[in-house]
Amino acid sequence: MHVSHPRTRRSLLLAASAALAVTGALLTSPPAKAADSPAPAEVSPHAAQTIDDIGASGAWWVNDLQHFSPAVRARVARLLFSEGGLELSSYRYNIGGGGTAVTTPARAAEDFLNPDGSYDWSRDEGGRTFLEYAARYGVKDLIGFVNSAPSRWTTNGKSCGGLLKAENEADFAGYIADVTDHFARQGVRLDYISPFNEPDNSFADCGQEGMPVPVDQRDDIVRALGAEQRARHRKTGIIADESSRTTQFNSELPQWISQPGTARYVSRLAHHTYNDPDDGELGKVHETSASVGKKSWATEICCFGKGTTGWNQEYDPTIDNALLMSRIIYKDFASSHDSAFQWWVALASGYGSDPSTRNDEGWNDGLIYYDPDYAADGNQKLYFTKRYYALGQYSKFVRPGSVAHNVTGAPNGVEVSTYDRNGQWVVVVNNHNTTGTALNLHFNSGTPVHASKAVRTSATENWANVAKPSVRHGTLSTTLAARSVTTYVLDRRGHGSTALAGAWQGQQSGKCLTADASGAAISTCTGGADQSWSYDAEGA
């Protein structure tokens, strides 16, 4: 469905929707429930992990969008990066390998290398354009990721199916560092580099760029790039290894990161979830990451459908697929305790037979879609999916620095995640049920006093401001709309940390303060009846 050009920055999401402290809080007890009221779900008082970012990648739709009008390109940037749009806090820029022998040219990015080793920085116009937009909008984490090294350094001379030659690892590291330096001179700082993507896949069919990287070479590449960046006094971090499946991540990561001198160069661990892992497997991701003392990121997923979160060809712009996406985000944050979620491609053209209707010819890989025949028919309309709005439920509210708290006891068919953000609670709720569902949610710390916002995405609503839930005695109570994703923002009492750790502890000062109308006096005392206790929200 075409969305008309928004008139104001503030109304981007609404326009698209129209087209389609002083004292710490003491622990509280939930109020007695009425006979027909469900038992409350419980928010843990213990912090789980701090969220770094939520975002998407610029592969490879930017190659098409460079041929769209400047007005459309600017609008897409606003829809993705601005406060009135998704307000993404990360963006993945594809550092190209040149596309040599790739049979689908649109699925490869130009590299900057000339045959003589010099650089042509005018290449990759589309990629550079949207990377610069992301920087201009202040996206927190800009990530450069590599699918293949330039073909001159691969074993088969292609940008697909060939390994990086061992003798060219330093050359490759120098190339990536040169790209990083160039963008820094342009005022665009790449915060992280991912030197290989899905290294377990050979991409030998050459349908896209890709480079297999054996387990015993991954540490060599990380060390080469890390040493090169350090020699140039760059603070760009390295993320790795972006395995396609969590099973590979769990078994292979410990092998390469344990090699001497490697771990110090790794800022974040990265995995994909194309094996549709269950909670147990996701829990192993957390264990693997914790065992090496690193935070993990979920850096790519797409293309699930037909009622499951497993790989399936389907195009579904409806709330059904949006709920599947939201379930994946929920599990990444709640089960593997990832600190970031990054969707595959922000835009795509593979909507199949009809951009407004579910069909089996397209793919669920984008948030927004455009006409694959734009060059012939001149159609530059944008088509929105419910996934766009569902991602916004997280990206706009679960901002960098938000602290996740696990939730237990949610009703059947309901998934609840909670985040402590700047003196407020953010609650994102997925209701997979086909009927309205009652929810009571009790907070064991940082007691909320009232709800300040409620936004819902459902079958009939894209981005709707809805009635706020009641909040009483630290418990949120509401009825969730059928088949919906809803975010609640709750103001709470006090602004200290909500994490409670360790045992209650106190320290006796040996002094007492006596005050009356004539003044105050400090005296030595031993406590006893004169002693009172207060709770410091910093915990033990």
What do these predicted regions represent?
Residues 1-35:
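Secretory targeting and sorting signals
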Residues 495-518, 532-540:
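Extracellular glycan-recognition/adhesion modules and their associated mucin-like linkers
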Residues 396, 408-450, 483:
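Carbohydrate-binding surface patches
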